[in-house]
Amino acid sequence: MSQKIVFTNDIAATLDTIVDEAAPNRVFVITDVNVDYFVLSRLSDCKTVAGATRIVIKSGDINKNVDSLSQVWKQLCDGGASRKSLIINIGGGVVTDLGGFAAATFKRGVRFVNVPTTLLSAVDAAVGGKTGINFNGFKNEVGAFCEADAVIISTRFLD
């Protein structure tokens, strides 16, 4: 599988096109509390984000753990996610790592898209298929290599 990497400042239109082409039965946006508050308003013109079920996790690397992962899995279940659903991870490395791992493991694999909002996540965490969580005091102790269907990188978020 080849990962599609898109550089654009028209995130809304690009995301809408990618989701339309994927034709999922449901769309979920995973983000953290900071991105939910400060960044998602910049995507108010994105019909995909507006119509998606939002899953918000606590911010910070300390929350990239099995408890947050379990919360995401539960909300995916409660929201009716299936293997035909699509997860969009909008955030920094914590969100793209944890969201990607949730996608890789839920129902044995759900398609996902990463929209990194930090420079580090744009060049490292969101690209290359590294997903995972911290466990037992160790960083990225549990994880999988699972590439996102697409990574949308924009300097709009790197203010």
Spell out what each predicted region is.
Residues 1-86:
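ATP/NTP phosphate-donor binding region
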Residues 38, 94-101, 122:
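Short glycine/serine/threonine-rich phosphate/pyrophosphate-binding segments
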Residues 69-75, 92, 105, 120-124:
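Hydrophobic, well-ordered secondary-structure scaffolds
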Residues 87-89, 93, 112:
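Short glycine-aspartate micro-motif
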Residues 101-159:
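A glycine/threonine-rich phosphate-anchoring loop and its flanking beta-alpha core
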